Amino acid sequence: MRHYEIVFMVHPDQSEQVPGMIERYTGAITGAEGKIHRLEDWGRRQLAYPINKLHKAHYVLLNVEAPQEVIDELETNFRFNDAVIRSMVMRTKHAVTEASPMVKAKDERRERRDDFANETADDADAGDSEE
């Protein structure tokens, strides 16, 4: 079996359907003895340029190991699903399991925000004790 990286973008009005879509697609992959190496739901993001007069889309990234028949089936599902506005399937040389730069940046922002909140709380506590 070969390794693939799959990214698909869902219409922003259909964001609530994304978990069901992910479950359906991962079920098709694992049902054919495939493996999911990485699954990231990037959420709703701004598009670089409008697609069908849309400026935002819900992004999902999958790194999988699956037979070609399953990949063909997924591409057909993407093509005929009106909620999927764009998709891309790329073959990779090996399984990618580390977090993507998108998730790493999000985690770093979250850590900085938490550190700032802790520092602010510590400063407020120190200010209360001086009075």
Curated annotation (Swiss-Prot):
Any single Gene Ontology cellular-component annotation: cytosolic small ribosomal subunit
Key words, A-Z: Ribonucleoprotein, Ribosomal protein, RNA-binding, rRNA-binding
Region feature (Disordered): 98-131
Paired cysteines (S-S): none
Gene Ontology biological process terms from the UniProt entry: translation
SUPFAM superfamilies per record: Ribosomal protein S6 (SSF54995)
Domain of life of the source: Bacteria
Acidic residues: bias regions: 120-131
Compositionally biased tracts (Basic and acidic residues): 104-116
MF GO annotations: small ribosomal subunit rRNA binding; structural constituent of ribosome
HAMAP family found in the cross-reference section: Ribosomal_bS6 (MF_00360)
Its biological purpose: Binds together with bS18 to 16S ribosomal RNA.
Similarity comment: family membership: Belongs to the bacterial ribosomal protein bS6 family.
Name the UniProt record assigns to this protein: Small ribosomal subunit protein bS6
